[in-house]
Curated annotation (Swiss-Prot):
One Pfam family it belongs to: AIRS
Keyword terms of this UniProt record: ATP-binding, Kinase, Magnesium, Metal-binding, Nucleotide-binding, Selenium, Transferase
Enzyme class at the top of the EC tree: transferase
Organism of this sequence: Trypanosoma brucei brucei (strain 927/4 GUTat10.1)
Cofactor(s) the record lists: Mg(2+)
Record site: Important for catalytic activity: K45
SUPFAM superfamilies: PurM C-terminal domain-like, PurM N-terminal domain-like
Assembly, per entry: Homodimer.
Organismal lineage: Eukaryota, Discoba, Euglenozoa, Kinetoplastea, Metakinetoplastina
One GO cellular component, as annotated: nucleoplasm
Signal sequence interval, chain numbering: none
Disordered, as annotated region: 1-21
Identification of the protein by name: Selenide, water dikinase
InterPro entries: PurM-like_C_dom, PurM-like_C_sf, PurM-like_N, PurM-like_N_sf, SPS/SelD
PANTHER family: INACTIVE SELENIDE, WATER DIKINASE-LIKE PROTEIN-RELATED (PTHR10256:SF0), SELENIDE, WATER DIKINASE (PTHR10256)
């Protein structure tokens, strides 16, 4: 993306890339990056219940309800030219490979770390540090090629987002790793804190669900697993799986930057991005951070069509239908005060970014010991197909 007259405008240069060909990079024909990890993308996160238990033993800032949300928001000693306080908003994220192509993996890594900033309505990142691990399980040539390609993809995507990589850390590790630290210094008016949801708010999601299923199926297509052979093979063909994987890969590398920029003009009350805890896990986290006592009720969920089919065949092994399937570089879950504001946001996002978004629920008053978020029992699944000639089929 680039800036024009102070506005974020869409920019697709660099987003399209030929299909991954390892031989052209000097790698073996059968090379695939996901062979070098057992935990893919954001599914490598410590499970949410375990993480919450660990955090209880660590002293955090007393009285802060947003501790544990996507970003750290710290008031600085410095002020802007009008004397108003400035805030440092920072986040870090990294993960193991989820796709076969190291360049694409770098793009996804950049989109994922920037997404945490975007969830606070910040669409301009001041600086990014890159965190990288080169794989000791690869031979020297494979390691050099893959590390360089991941770095290129990461740096190119950060530049596409209007920022620069200004440093970082690179280490050796059996599994490759990519991620970073994103930081912006902003005034209060330039961000939307994640604590302002109110009963009656309407919830919008900006990307479909089902990435984890997509990347697993893609790997199983090349290296069949017992579950693939027993439950998928013969019931989903390679074309269906490739279509699902390509749609998910495009979604994972897509920046949430425009979605962040439009939050301000449509009166968003707060947001989170959907990653390793699944949509319901992140909705619960968002609900628990609110000043008001609220519950987020999800009544419709957009899912990639192929992921829906595969999940049914596997008995919902990855808990997609429960709302707990891990997503990598997923969409923003945004709350708006009225349905008109939510629909206006969806419409403008499609007009400017060319991508759909969906109303997925509402915010209600939380009663007693009710959960901070829940899936409505009869919730609707919206099946999302591949994108052909810029139309969703």
């Amino acid at each position: 993306m680039s800036e024009k007259e102070g506005k974020v405008i869409p920019e697709t240069n660099g987003m399209k890339r030929p299909r991954f060909d390892p031989v052209k990079l000097g790698l073996p024909e059968e090379f695939t990056l996901t062979d070098y990890t057992r935990l893919k993308g954001c599914s490598c996160k410590v499970p949410q219940p375990e993480l919450l238990a660990l955090l209880q033993s660590v002293s955090t800032t007393p009285g802060r309800r947003d501790v544990g949300m996507d970003c750290s928001i710290v008031k600085l000693q410095h002020k802007d030219e009008t004397g108003k306080p400035l805030y440092m908003v920072s986040t870090t994220d990294f993960f193991f490979p989820s796709v076969e192509d190291p360049y694409l993996q770098g793009q996804i890594g950049a989109a994922n770390v920037l997404s945490d900033l975007y969830s606070t309505g910040i669409d301009r990142c001041d600086t990014v540090l890159m965190l990288l691990a080169a794989s000791t399980d690869m031979d020297k040539t494979e390691r050099e090629v893959c590390t360089q390609e991941m770095m290129k993809g990461f740096v190119d995507h950060v530049r596409l987002a209007g920022s620069d990589v200004t440093g970082g850390q690179t280490v050796m590790n059996p599994w490759p790793l990519i991620g970073g630290i994103a930081t912006s210094v902003v005034a209060e008016s330039q961000m939307i804190r994640p604590t302002g949801l109110q009963p009656g708010d309407i919830l919008v999601l900006t990307k479909p669900l089902g990435c984890q299923i997509a990347v697993n199926l893609k790997q199983w297509l090349r290296r069949p697993s017992p579950i693939f052979e027993e439950q998928i093979q013969g019931k989903m063909d390679s074309e269906e799986i490739e279509e699902l994987y390509n749609a998910a890969a495009d979604g994972m590398k897509r920046l949430n930057r425009m979605a962040a920029a439009l939050m301000h003009s449509h009166g968003a009350h707060g947001a989170t991005d959907v990653t390793g805890f699944g949509i319901l896990g992140h909705a619960k986290n968002l609900g628990s951070a609110q000043k008001a006592d609220v519950c987020l009720v999800l009544d419709s969920l957009p899912m990639y069509r192929g992921a829906v089919k595969a999940s049914k065949l596997m008995g919902d092994k990855y808990r997609l239908f429960e709302g707990y399937a891990a997503e990598t570089s997923g969409g923003l879950l945004v709350a708006f005060g009225t349905r008109e504001e939510a629909e206006g946001y969806i419409r403008e996002l499609y007009e400017t970014d060319g991508e759909p978004a969906w109303v997925v629920g509402r915010v209600v008053r939380r009663e007693g010991s009710a959960p901070y978020a829940l899936l409505q029992k009869d919730y609707k699944i919206i099946e999302v197909g591949a994108k052909v000639n810029d139309k969703i089929i």
